[in-house]
């Protein structure tokens, strides 16, 4: 019988998406194939402390739909794993690549004398999917699920991401990028710069954040200022995008853009899932609509023509390659609600949610890849990518 791989599951983190990460980790720990993998859950507190919980099963306590209700009520202990992050054993990852071994491993100290064979970072947002923790894995010489340092950082920064999309010939909405310092120094000048390029409504976003945290929709100059202030709480760089549909006319909102999503899986030969659609329960698919509201409705597969579906799936793979991604990504699109029904690529998410209501696993399940198999494939792609990296020479003396 083949020896089981020891998989480190990282969750939590210094991020506005900390709670979402705990929910995702609970789902992954419940579904991972225990016949193939030994699991070491590793929590990261909001302050950045690494903890190795003693009892992984505690992470699964509670039903995630109940968790969502408790989160809405502001319960700080609502999420699975919250208790573990108070009771875990302080730990760290030793950046010491293995020498002469068939597989790179990383040690956890002092929580476990054993080595990890691979890491699955179930981390969302800053310090989780922005390339920082991926750099630590590279230093430690350990295989990990997901994109590398470059792809992760590019996939996190909406400004850089859009530049890569444009260079690859992918259609994007008009946008303006300003710095927080520019907005604070000269608000009138910043607003004039935005209004020169874009028409209302516009979406204002922190450049480096996910799960729609800090995003607002502005219908006019009066609402633009507060939207910029909100985004500026989270990042030094602000991205303002042209809205697609949803114009405010005579006090009424026009038809909204269709919000479409595709899950991509693989390394050098990535595959795209069926196309899904989200019907938000609110004006747009914000943080509350994604994780706390029961009003949003996923439609899988989306109601599209065969040609539209083919185009969107091809664009998803092209975006994956343009950002040099690996392992997994969810690619989001906007489609005009009427007229020419033009399709725009919105963004990529390099570590999409794995909660019970997350689209990434749902899209693959609809494509024929069950959740447990999906996790196994992601770990296999991490090992495949590590083998490919081992072919690289890092000095002239390497043999």
Residue ranges of model-derived segments:
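ATP-binding N-terminal substructure of ATP-dependent carboxylate-amine bond-forming enzymes
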Residues: 1-150, 154-156, 160, 167, ...
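Active-site nucleotide/adenylate-binding loops and adjacent lid/helix of ATP-dependent enzymes
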Residues: 2-10, 15-16, 22-23, 109-114, ...
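ATP-dependent carboxylate activation and anion-phosphoryl transfer catalytic cores
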Residues: 2-5, 11-15, 34, 169, ...
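Solvent-exposed alpha-helix faces
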Residues: 26-27, 229, 317
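Hydrophobic beta-strand scaffold residues
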Residues: 39, 143-144, 172, 202, ...
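A glycine- and small-aliphatic-rich helix-loop capping segment at beta-alpha/alpha-beta transitions
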Residues: 135-144, 220, 225, 366-367
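Phosphate-binding site of ATP-dependent enzymes
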Residues: 216-314, 337-344
């Amino acid at each position: 019988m083949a020896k089981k791989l020891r998989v480190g599951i990282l969750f939590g983190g210094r991020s506005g998406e900390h709670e979402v990460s705990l929910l995702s980790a609970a789902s992954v720990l419940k579904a991972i194939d225990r016949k193939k993998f030994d699991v070491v859950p590793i929590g990261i507190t909001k302050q950045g402390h690494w903890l190795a919980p003693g009892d992984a099963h505690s992470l699964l306590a509670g039903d995630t739909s109940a968790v969502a209700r408790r989160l809405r009520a502001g319960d700080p202990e609502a999420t699975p794993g919250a208790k573990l992050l108070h009771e875990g054993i302080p730990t760290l990852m030793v950046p010491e690549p293995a020498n002469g071994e068939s597989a790179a491993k990383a040690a956890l100290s002092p929580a476990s004398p054993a080595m990890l064979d691979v890491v699955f970072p179930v981390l969302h947002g800053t310090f989780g999917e922005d390339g920082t923790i991926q750099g630590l894995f590279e230093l430690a010489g350990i295989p990990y699920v997901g994109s590398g340092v470059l792809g992760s950082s590019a996939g996190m920064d909406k400004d850089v991401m859009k530049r890569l999309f444009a260079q690859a010939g992918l259609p994007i909405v008009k946008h303006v990028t300003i710095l927080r310092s520019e907005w604070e120094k000269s608000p009138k000048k910043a607003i004039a710069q935005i209004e020169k390029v874009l028409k209302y409504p516009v979406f204002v976003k922190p450049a480096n954040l996910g799960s729609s945290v800090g995003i607002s929709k502005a219908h006019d100059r009066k609402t633009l200022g507060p939207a910029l202030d909100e985004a500026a709480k989270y990042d030094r760089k602000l991205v303002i995008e042209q809205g697609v549909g949803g114009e405010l006319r005579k006090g009424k909102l026009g038809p909204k853009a269709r919000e479409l999503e595709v899950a991509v899986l693989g390394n050098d030969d990535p595959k795209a899932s069926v196309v899904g659609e989200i019907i938000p329960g609110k004006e747009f698919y914000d943080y509350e609509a994604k994780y706390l509201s029961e009003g949003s409705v996923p439609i899988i597969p989306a109601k599209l023509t065969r040609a539209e579906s083919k185009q969107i799936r091809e664009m998803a793979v092209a975006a994956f390659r343009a950002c040099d991604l690996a392992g997994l990504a969810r690619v989001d699109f906007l489609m005009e609600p009427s007229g020419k029904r033009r399709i725009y690529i919105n963004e990529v998410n390099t570590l999409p949610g794995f909660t019970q209501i997350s689209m990434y696993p749902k899209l693959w399940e609809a494509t024929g890849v069950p959740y447990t198999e999906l996790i196994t494939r992601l770990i296999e792609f991490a090992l495949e990518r590590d083998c490919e990296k081992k072919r690289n020479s890092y000095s002239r003396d390497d043999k």
